[in-house]
């Protein structure tokens, strides 16, 4: 528990009803659930679990909870148990009600706001328990406290059974069991892997905290137990497990100031991509903020000063922040009172004092580390200097691309068949594998709003290439120029010429490879394209089934068999003609339009990226240098090959 205690601020008094503050009522939650949990899709469904777990994490941050259990039961009923102090059960002065009832029925009620109950707290603006209650068909909470077991039951935010004592206990803690309300959610089936990924993240962020997760649903049984004494150091090692480290140690730095603390773990690898993952009070901040800014400033300053000191940088030589972060994996975690997040979803941290704190910690500790480990310091600096030279080469290559670039047809790639429409929100570009398929697509498209760009030959695997190679690659340059938005830090969404970028490749191994190469390119060099939801994969059919005048398409063997049986009806001997599409190039323009390009009849899969760390790991695995981990992954996931790219 020493690491956990080091990273939390212990609140030295009882946690009682007087610590619960009430800010406003619950009425709005069921009317506008998206305001409180982001959406009513699967993302929002899983958010319910995170809200309850966040309350348990708060107990861990305060130094009172060492273990959390999360279970998915039959019927997708969730149970979260912790061994904290237990939610208060005494009377809350402001309302005259039991504090337990207040926590679960009144929005913004919790020990989070005045600093009395918790010095540091995560959760979505403190709305947790009551919002989960409002969006649950039913919810039961049991509290072990004062030697007694208290129980209270709710339905859709209302009390159905008052708080009663149901037994005695020698333990303390809270158990919340709930069933999401199908009236509120598009889907109520939980995905174990999604919850497991989030719980693993929480375990990394709270050193020494044990989190158990299990799936008890019939046919889906699995479980895991996670506890990382090394905290975010182990998180960095986990992310880098299929990369080749530049130095063996994960560099760890931490410090405190008043009621705030920050910790940073970092390690370089021999790749070219930066992975920065930041958190504030255990909440992921994908858009960064002041803590990231403080780290970047300190890193650049320290490496330049060190380079001058050891004579690697001479005169006016210097390395940029981008150079310093090439091949870097870093986790930044800060914990603070009164965290200011920009936006309801807490995507960016706004507390300027965190920039100062992180900058100070990294400046002092990193300088000291480099002094004590000169071989590591030299390796890091030489990598940054090499990145600097490559960046200059990339800039020259980029200028060459820019000189040829522009939004008018004359300067666009010769192979591009552009559309007439100029409003990007109405246009789409099909990036098509092979000239023959490209020809059919050109003839079959609606040229008012559909552009076609055929690709041919062997494409560059950008996972193994620096930016200068990408800019100079004759297979990728047409894609860069056609899209018009630039690459990397120069990517400008306002210049994007199409708001649907559709990858159209055969449904075979070669097609999957092309899709993966393109997705790797977009992920590494045009990530906003994926983050904003502009990238799609066309899903061409595999089979055409005909009986008489009725023709149907099937996208899998299972669907083929089901449609075949449906067409035969009550006559099992009826003849159904089944033909297999071997490739896009075999379809005539009319077929390609009907099956793959007509907005009324086609199937498109939007490529999403909810977990950047997981996406990075998969791209590194599938497209990186190490063969053995890739072989293992493919062998383990071969049965899911149909979904591998999505």
Residue ranges with predicted function:
Residues 87-110:
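Short conserved segment of the HATPase_c
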Residues 93, 342-355, 553-559, 563, ...:
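Helical (often loop-to-helix) elements that flank the catalytic cores of nucleotide-handling enzymes
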Residues 1-18, 26, 50, 58-60, ...:
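GHKL-family ATPase ATP-binding module
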Residues 31-50:
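Conserved short strand/loop->alpha-helix "switch" segment adjacent to the catalytic nucleotide/phosphoryl-transfer site
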Residues 58-59, 86-87, 509-510:
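Residues immediately C-terminal
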Residues 389-408, 423-428, 439, 443-445, ...:
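C-terminal interaction appendages of subunits in large macromolecular complexes
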């Amino acid at each position: 528990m020493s690491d956990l205690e080091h990273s939390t601020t212990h609140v030295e008094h009882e946690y009682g009803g007087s610590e619960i503050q009430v800010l406003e009522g619950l009425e709005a939650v069921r009317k506008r659930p998206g305001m409180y949990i982001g959406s009513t899709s699967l993302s929002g469904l899983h958010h319910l679990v995170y809200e309850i777990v966040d309350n348990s994490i708060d107990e861990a941050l305060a130094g009172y909870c060492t273990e959390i259990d999360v279970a998915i039961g039959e019927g997708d009923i969730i149970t979260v148990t912790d061994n904290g102090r237990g939610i208060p059960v005494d009377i809350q002065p402001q309302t005259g009600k039991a504090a337990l009832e207040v926590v679960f029925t009144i929005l913004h009620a919790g020990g989070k706001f005045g600093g009395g109950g918790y010095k540091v707290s995560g959760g979505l603006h403190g709305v947790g328990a009551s919002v989960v209650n409002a969006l649950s068909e039913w919810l039961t909470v049991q509290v072990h406290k004062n030697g007694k077991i208290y129980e209270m039951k709710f339905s859709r935010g209302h009390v159905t059974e008052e708080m009663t004592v149901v037994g005695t206990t020698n333990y303390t803690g809270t158990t919340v069991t709930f069933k999401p309300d199908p009236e509120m959610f598009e889907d109520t089936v939980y995905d174990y892997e999604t919850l497991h990924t989030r719980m693993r993240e929480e375990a990394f962020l709270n050193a020494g905290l044990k989190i158990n997760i299990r799936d008890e649903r019939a046919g889906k049984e699995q479980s895991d137990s996670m506890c990382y004494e090394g905290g975010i150091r182990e998180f960095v090692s986990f992310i880098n497990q299929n990369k080749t480290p530049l130095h063996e140690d994960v560099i760890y730095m931490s410090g405190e100031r008043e009621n705030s603390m920050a910790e940073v773990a970092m390690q370089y690898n021999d790749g070219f991509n930066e992975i920065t993952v930041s958190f504030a009070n255990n909440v992921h901040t994908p858009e960064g903020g002041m803590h990231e800014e403080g780290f970047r400033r300190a890193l650049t300053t320290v490496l330049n000063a060190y380079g001058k000191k050891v004579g690697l940088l001479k005169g006016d030589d210097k390395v940029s922040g981008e150079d310093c972060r090439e091949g870097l994996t870093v986790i930044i975690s800060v914990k603070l009172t009164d965290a200011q997040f920009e936006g309801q979803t807490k995507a960016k941290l706004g507390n300027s004092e965190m920039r100062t704190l992180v900058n100070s910690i990294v400046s002092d500790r990193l300088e000291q580390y480099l002094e004590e480990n000169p071989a590591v310091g030299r390796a890091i600096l030489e990598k940054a200097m090499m990145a600097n030279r490559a960046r200059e080469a990339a800039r020259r290559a980029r200028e060459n691309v820019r000189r040829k670039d522009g939004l008018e047809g004359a300067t666009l790639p010769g192979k591009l068949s552009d559309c007439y429409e100029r409003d990007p929100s109405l246009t789409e570009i099909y990036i098509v594998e092979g000239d023959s398929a490209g020809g059919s697509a050109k003839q079959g498209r609606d040229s008012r709003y559909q552009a076609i760009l055929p690709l041919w030959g062997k494409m560059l695997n950008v996972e193994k290439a620096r930016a200068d190679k990408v800019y100079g690659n004759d297979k990728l340059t047409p894609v860069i120029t056609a899209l018009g938005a630039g690459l990397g830090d120069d990517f400008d969404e306002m210049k994007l010429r199409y708001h649907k970028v559709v990858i159209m490749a055969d449904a075979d191994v070669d097609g999957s490879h092309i899709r993966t190469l393109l997705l790797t390119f977009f992920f590494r060099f045009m990530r906003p394209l994926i983050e904003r939801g502009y990238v799609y994969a066309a899903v061409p059919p595999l089979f055409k089934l005909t009986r008489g005048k009725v023709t149907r398409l099937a996208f899998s063997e299972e669907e083929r068999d089901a449609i075949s049986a449906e067409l035969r009806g009550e006559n099992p001997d009826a003849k159904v003609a089944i033909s297999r599409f071997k490739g896009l190039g075999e379809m005539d323009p009319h077929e390609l339009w009907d099956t793959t390009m007509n907005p009324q009849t086609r199937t498109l899969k939007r490529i999403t990226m909810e977990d950047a760390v997981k996406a990075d790991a998969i791209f590194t695995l599938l497209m990186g240098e190490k063969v053995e981990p890739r072989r293992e992954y493919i062998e383990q996931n071969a049965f899911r090959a149909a979904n591998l790219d999505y």
